[in-house]
């Protein structure tokens, strides 16, 4: 539903801390250490509580109102075939991996069981036949490393193990008592830190293995504080890989990547037929060392027939108040099921409160009691057993509302929505904050064994749109509109009859269907599966974690093969570095072809070419101390030093080479593949590989990260700046008249990884030829794999300023342009009203496509005239901005923030909340009133006939974008005088407000319709216009007819959109321009009818 409270994505992240190098001399303050200690203790307690909860006695749903007879056999998973664990292997695609604490199980070839609690990993997945699987993986214990202190030998191992185990047990008092030793083993081994090149090879490290994952944090903390070792005093131990999640640690060691296929060999696993812990069809136990992991290549790239469920709910709210689960009932829950790979949903189900008329193609199940309705849905979930659950804003509205409502009504068996028997789905609050998105509060609902893909959260994270309502995104990506029912109307439909409830159910089913369409169209599931495979993390991590865990996983895998360890780095310092180079643009309108040359994967290529990595970094002065020859290391443009690959090949360059070569193979396979499902997988894979390669550089420069390294990130951008400058110099020195070319080439602009070159030729074909030649020639001057490629030609080309340009793009065919490309202009920005984007786009189209600058000027003047004369529809004037912080947290007053506060006072339930985009228009007010005081809700403006501040829109919204476009064509001084002054700006229309101001103290008097003079009676005309009364009446009737015809057209269009030509239009979609037009015309009709009533009833002579 579009009225749901929308809040932003993501789990909470710690407050930002500044970045610093590994070798900073300053020690952290005691206060910072205490804060870190508190944070770790809280994390331990949360993990401990979660593990304890997992051990609660089963209470799963029993009975319920959704009987077996109500279930279509096609909804269920296929019946389980006989499986012999001794002769048949079990092969399945895992979707989610987590862990819990339980009792050990006797397994073939496994160690003897004990009464102590042990960590058990749990992999949920699906077989090729569609059977659901839960695999309990035993025998893997958490561990981390620390350098052995000087003088430490094998004789000290038992003493350290005893001291550390005692210290951890003492530290855990007050919590759950440990049933056995905290430290299982401490071993001596040879490893090397990945941070910096030391030249001495491996050194002694201690591998500390613990009983439970939650003991890693206290063990690390106690070791950092110092542990007594007989004969060595109380040395402090620096932790390595102690901040790695238990699941990631297991997947790295077992060589398992996200969503890959696992094989359990025959005779190595035990099938649980009794005492099952989950609702899965197949539940097995196996040793972690017996699990075979298949790399996602060839036949193992396929995706199992996953079952995807999309759902939506409707609530009956009170008038003007947003639904609250403590008071407002759930009246409908609609669900659609899809088997991945099939074209159509196999399941359409509407659960309704009170009888509902049948719906073609869907099963309708009605209930008289809300408690029965609520119990039926989890029972249906249990029967259908979905692998993936999707919807629109289910994370922040649907799921929390259902769970809270069931709790209010004491439907105790409702919140068992996951696959683990007896484990409740709980709600917890989460907060995410960053410079890019500000602060977003959200909720997280646990549903173990099922992957949640909230399409609103996906779109917020991956796409920048003006509006994120389901209607807006459906129109943007699918080209489809939908009926949008206001929450206050939903109650009226519910209280109507079977047909009105049917209409509500159809609306609800469509709201469940559209997220499925979006999931398929945007390839969200496929892309995330492939990203999980490429980066090696569980699928759930991609949806709830940040970017860094993806690089950490790849880094750990590569490091393990070479005996390298990742240190735990405390980020302290606060340095910054210079970003990429932008060559100063030569602004203007170019009516000649401009060739664009682009560095392919610039930052990854730089890191590979120059061997930039943690493992190759030299400390200041280290090159001399280690006796390195000048040809064995490089000095970067920023003064940092790294050894060359001949001395040591860096980890990051190896990771990048693997990613880019895998992408090349995936693209080659994609070009040959004909099967549409396989093409989707390959396309998702090559995209995941590209994104992963580009994110490695960002990982090294992250302010608060697992392993920040300023030396790498600043060196990369330093080389990038140097290469752009060198490319400019090479192009302009070769392509000259002296060297036999038609003209002297000129680089008109360069930005980060691309340069725009004017070769002085007149045809696109010649520019393409010279562009390819120049790309190959320049590439020969840079080390491999750095490569400059010809990308496209712009003709014509409008260069406005840095990061702002537009042109017709030719990439392959010199005779036909691909599209009109705009960067940084209001045509593609979302922080202006649609009028700006539409006017900029239409003006650019006239300039670039039609080659008619004069026509563009005339069109812009016409639009400005329409604006000043109040002929622009209000939907074109709506500005939307995101509410990223509370009002008190903004440094200055903001228009959308102030409006949100006013709307909260009018109606707290429907007011925008954090993470929402707030639509508003600027209305007219007294001179000197600040713009933030003039923001108002568009619907409120229409209902109360508030005047629009057209001068604001002309001066603050249209003026600068138009001048940016037309100044290169008309000249800086002339553009302003032609566009913003002149006859077209002299005629203005101002509406009279019906509320506020001095109108509260004035008495309204009628005016003559003919001459506008004040009259003292209720009639339509004065005595001087009386002879023309018939003529004036006919004129107003004609105006009324025109309004009625316009309203009928708009009404019919809305009826077609809602799918019924015989029902009232109740849609209130604020993202649809038709809605505002319909509201405006309806109001104009009412005013016109009142005006005609002033003429009085027709006299006898009219008959």
Swiss-Prot record:
Cell location: Nucleus
Locus of motif Nuclear localization signal: 4-19
Region (Disordered): 1-29
Motif stretch (CysB motif): 1054-1072
Protein activity control: Regulated by alteration of quaternary structure. Exhibits burst rates of DNA synthesis are about 5 times faster in the presence of POLD4 (Pol-delta4 complex) than in its absence (Pol-delta3 complex), while the affinity of the enzyme for its DNA and dNTP substrates appears unchanged. The Pol-delta3 complex is more likely to proofread DNA synthesis because it cleaves single-stranded DNA twice as fast and transfers mismatched DNA from the polymerase to the exonuclease sites 9 times faster compared to the Pol-delta3 complex.
Residue positions where Omega-N-methylarginine is found in the record: 19
PROSITE patterns: DNA_POLYMERASE_B
Molecular function terms, GO-annotated: 3'-5'-DNA exonuclease activity; 4 iron, 4 sulfur cluster binding; chromatin binding; damaged DNA binding; DNA-directed DNA polymerase activity; nucleotide binding; zinc ion binding
Zinc finger (CysA-type) stretch: 1008-1025
Entry cofactors: [4Fe-4S] cluster
Record note on cofactor: Binds 1 [4Fe-4S] cluster.
GO biological process, one term: DNA synthesis involved in DNA repair
Cross-link (Glycyl lysine isopeptide (Lys-Gly) (interchain with G-Cter in SUMO2)): 570
InterPro entries assigned: DNA-dir_DNA_pol_B, DNA-dir_DNA_pol_B_CS, DNA-dir_DNA_pol_B_exonuc, DNA-dir_DNA_pol_B_multi_dom, DNA/RNA_pol_sf, DNA_pol_B_thumb, DNA_pol_palm_dom_sf, DNA_pol_type-B
EC number: 2.7.7.7, 3.1.11.-
Primary role: As the catalytic component of the trimeric (Pol-delta3 complex) and tetrameric DNA polymerase delta complexes (Pol-delta4 complex), plays a crucial role in high fidelity genome replication, including in lagging strand synthesis, and repair. Exhibits both DNA polymerase and 3'- to 5'-exonuclease activities. Requires the presence of accessory proteins POLD2, POLD3 and POLD4 for full activity. Depending upon the absence (Pol-delta3) or the presence of POLD4 (Pol-delta4), displays differences in catalytic activity.
Family under the similarity heading: Belongs to the DNA polymerase type-B family.
Protein's recorded name: DNA polymerase delta catalytic subunit
Species annotation: Mesocricetus auratus
Lineage per the UniProt record: Eukaryota, Metazoa, Chordata, Craniata, Vertebrata
